[in-house]
């Protein structure tokens, strides 16, 4: 039998100096995606993709690790400055922003883009613990 040769596309090194870091922080996970100014994805990471499972995904430390991984991957493409767009009520918001600054990316602006309903669907009932 002939084995099929699998070809893997090489990652093209883009030369992008500024972009947007989208931090989506939920109660269960934190996702960090770094895009160029037009919105094309350059690098992304999440707490779950780094091996955190269950309730450990929702910790600030997991958000910090996800932000570091995404920042390092984007710096390979020449990223130097980012605007930060934070979405969601999760615990990893501030930790992810601090981690982006600690890796050497210059944060030029921080925006909160959490969607606020104009009385949309009914929210889930309050937890009684």
UniProtKB/Swiss-Prot annotation:
Record bears the keyword Cell membrane: no
A Pfam family matched in the record:
Ribosomal_S11
Q: Which GO terms describe its cellular component?
A: ribonucleoprotein complex; ribosome
Name residues in a coiled coil.
none
UniProt xrefs under InterPro entries = Ribosomal_uS11 (IPR001971), Ribosomal_uS11_bac-type (IPR019981), Ribosomal_uS11_CS (IPR018102), Ribosomal_uS11_sf (IPR036967)
Sorted alphabetically, which keywords does the UniProt record give?
Ribonucleoprotein, Ribosomal protein, RNA-binding, rRNA-binding
A molecular function (GO) held by this record is: rRNA binding
- Biological process annotations from GO: translation
Q: Which family does it belong to?
A: Belongs to the universal ribosomal protein uS11 family.
Q: Give the quaternary structure.
A: Part of the 30S ribosomal subunit. Interacts with proteins S7 and S18. Binds to IF-3.
**UniProt xrefs under PANTHER family:** 40S RIBOSOMAL PROTEIN S14/30S RIBOSOMAL PROTEIN S11 (PTHR11759)
**Listed NCBIfam families:** PRK05309.1, uS11_bact
Question: Briefly, what is this protein's role?
Answer: Located on the platform of the 30S subunit, it bridges several disparate RNA helices of the 16S rRNA. Forms part of the Shine-Dalgarno cleft in the 70S ribosome.
* Name of this chain's protein: Small ribosomal subunit protein uS11
User: In which organism is this protein found?
Assistant: Lactiplantibacillus plantarum (strain ATCC BAA-793 / NCIMB 8826 / WCFS1)
Lineage, please? Bacteria, Bacillati, Bacillota, Bacilli, Lactobacillales
């Amino acid at each position: 039998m002939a084995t099929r040769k699998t070809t893997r596309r090489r990652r093209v090194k883009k030369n992008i100096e500024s972009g947007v870091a989208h931090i989506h922080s939920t109660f269960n996970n934190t996702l960090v995606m770094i895009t160029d100014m037009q919105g094309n994805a350059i690098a992304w990471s999440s707490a779950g993709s780094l091996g955190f499972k269950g309730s450990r995904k929702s910790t600030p430390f997991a958000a910090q690790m996800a932000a570091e991984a995404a920042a390092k991957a984007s710096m390979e493409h020449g990223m130097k400055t980012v605007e930060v767009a934070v979405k969601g009520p999760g615990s990893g918001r501030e930790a992810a922003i601090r981690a982006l600054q600690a890796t050497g990316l210059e944060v030029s602006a921080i925006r909160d883009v959490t969607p606020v309903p104009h009385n949309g669907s009914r929210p889930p009932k309050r937890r009684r613990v």
